[in-house]
């Protein structure tokens, strides 16, 4: 029985890591394009997208192409899903929408071009993006540490 439990824990740990790794590899190029255009670190973009969409597997992520939990019209006639979250025609549009939202905030000009991911995450969280800013920041920073540290 102990061996079975160990095997299950190992499997689920690997699956979780594998899913995170897949999300980061699938959207790395898109996030880098967004970094070039908006000067927001690509790893911040990826970590927020991963957290808010469950690695792209959440209902909102799949049906509304919304990887960032952005609130707005869900367009149920198009998406087939009524929600308080915004519908995007493509995942790419969701990434653009996130970067445009962040670039409209007061802290953006001060951080634009900075590679300090902690400052970005803390500013986004304290700027009203997350209901529980402290927990959200801690989680996003942990995702960044796991996937973006060299």
Please report, for each region that a protein language model flagged, where it lies by residue.
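Catalytic cores of secreted/periplasmic lytic hydrolases that degrade extracellular macromolecules
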Residues: 16-150
């Amino acid at each position: 029985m102990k061996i079975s439990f160990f095997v299950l824990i190992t499997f689920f740990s690997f699956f979780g890591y594998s899913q995170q790794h897949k999300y980061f590899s699938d959207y790395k190029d898109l996030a880098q394009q967004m970094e070039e255009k908006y000067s927001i670190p690509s790893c911040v973009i990826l970590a927020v997208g991963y957290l808010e969409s469950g690695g792209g597997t959440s209902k909102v992520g799949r049906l509304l192409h919304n990887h960032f939990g952005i609130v707005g019209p869900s367009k149920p006639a198009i998406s087939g899903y009524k929600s308080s979250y915004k519908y995007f025609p493509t995942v790419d549009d969701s990434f653009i929408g996130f970067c445009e939202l962040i670039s409209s905030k007061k802290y953006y000009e001060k951080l634009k071009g900075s590679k300090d991911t902690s400052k970005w995450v803390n500013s986004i969280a304290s700027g009203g993006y997350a209901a529980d800013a402290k927990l959200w920041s801690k989680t996003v920073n942990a995702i960044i540490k796991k996937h973006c540290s060299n």
